[in-house]
């Protein structure tokens, strides 16, 4: 399944707020899941499906990419669900988004793809690059690159940058202090249901 490129309003109304997909908010319709269905097996499957879709659309992943991350998380030490969220949160495109350098994760991915971003003084154009504690993320020393980021940081300031990151808005320089903690994930999600959804595929 390819990355979703359709209307974002439709997704938000169906699944609720997904800040990585869009910074706009809409009045949600009732969930596409029929909670009152008498077939509990089908209902539980759809609940898990909804949580999986939230994760996929928020981070802008294909089905294959998300499944790959689940498999990696299952092999790691610790809670599979929390490791999964850490893997997704530490992606370069998401880190750029959390720095307020872009209004959405797709916007951050575009900055990376267009080679506006440097990590530890080297250009990185891979959105899935895994950021690690100690990484320094900067903007290419080009007027166009710096102009885009400055505009974004001025327009799309969020309430608070998570504690595992530090951003110097005057130098347009970000630092990864540590691996993200669960409480700093800015998505309302039950990651255990996502792991359960994929339990037969991994």
Curated annotation (Swiss-Prot):
Main subcellular localization, coarse class? plastid
What's any one GO cellular component for it?
Answer: chloroplast
User: One MF term in GO for this entry?
Assistant: structural constituent of ribosome
Matching PROSITE patterns: RIBOSOMAL_S4, S4
Q: Does the keyword Chloroplast apply?
A: yes
Q: Which domain of life is it from?
A: Eukaryota
Pfam families given in the database record: Ribosomal_S4, S4
Residue ranges constituting the S4 RNA-binding domain according to the UniProt record: 90-159
Q: Which UniProt keywords apply?
A: Chloroplast, Plastid, Ribonucleoprotein, Ribosomal protein, RNA-binding, rRNA-binding
What is one process in the GO biological process aspect for this record? translation
Where does this protein reside within or beyond the cell?
A: Plastid, Chloroplast
Q: Which family does it belong to?
A: Belongs to the universal ribosomal protein uS4 family.
Provide the function of this protein.
One of the primary rRNA binding proteins, it binds directly to 16S rRNA where it nucleates assembly of the body of the 30S subunit.
Q: HAMAP family per the record?
A: Ribosomal_uS4_B
Subunit arrangement?
Part of the 30S ribosomal subunit. Contacts protein S5. The interaction surface between S4 and S5 is involved in control of translational fidelity.
Q: What protein am I looking at? A: Small ribosomal subunit protein uS4c
Which organism does this sequence originate in? Jamesoniella autumnalis (Liverwort)
Q: Which gene encodes it?
A: rps4
């Amino acid at each position: 399944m390819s990355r979703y490129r359709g209307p974002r309003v439709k997704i938000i109304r169906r699944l609720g707020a997904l800040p990585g997909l869009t910074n706009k908010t809409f009045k949600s319709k009732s969930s596409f899941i029929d909670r009152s269905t008498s077939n509990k097996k089908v209902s539980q499957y759809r609940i898990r499906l909804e949580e999986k879709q939230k994760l996929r659309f928020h981070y802008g992943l294909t089905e294959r990419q998300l499944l790959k991350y689940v498999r990696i998380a299952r092999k790691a030490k610790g809670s599979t669900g929390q490791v999964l969220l850490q893997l997704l949160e530490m992606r370069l495109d998401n880190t750029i988004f959390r720095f307020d350098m872009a209004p959405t994760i797709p916007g951050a991915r575009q900055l990376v793809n267009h080679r506006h971003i440097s990590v530890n003084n080297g250009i990185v154009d891979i959105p899935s690059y895994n950021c690690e504690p100690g990484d320094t993320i900067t903007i290419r020393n080009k007027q166009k690159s710096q102009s885009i980021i400055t505009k974004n940081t001025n327009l799309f300031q969020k309430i608070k940058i998570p504690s595992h990151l530090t951003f110097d808005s005057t130098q347009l320089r970000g630092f990864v202090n540590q691996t993200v903690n669960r409480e700093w994930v800015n998505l309302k999600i039950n990651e255990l249901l996502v792991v359960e959804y994929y339990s037969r595929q991994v």
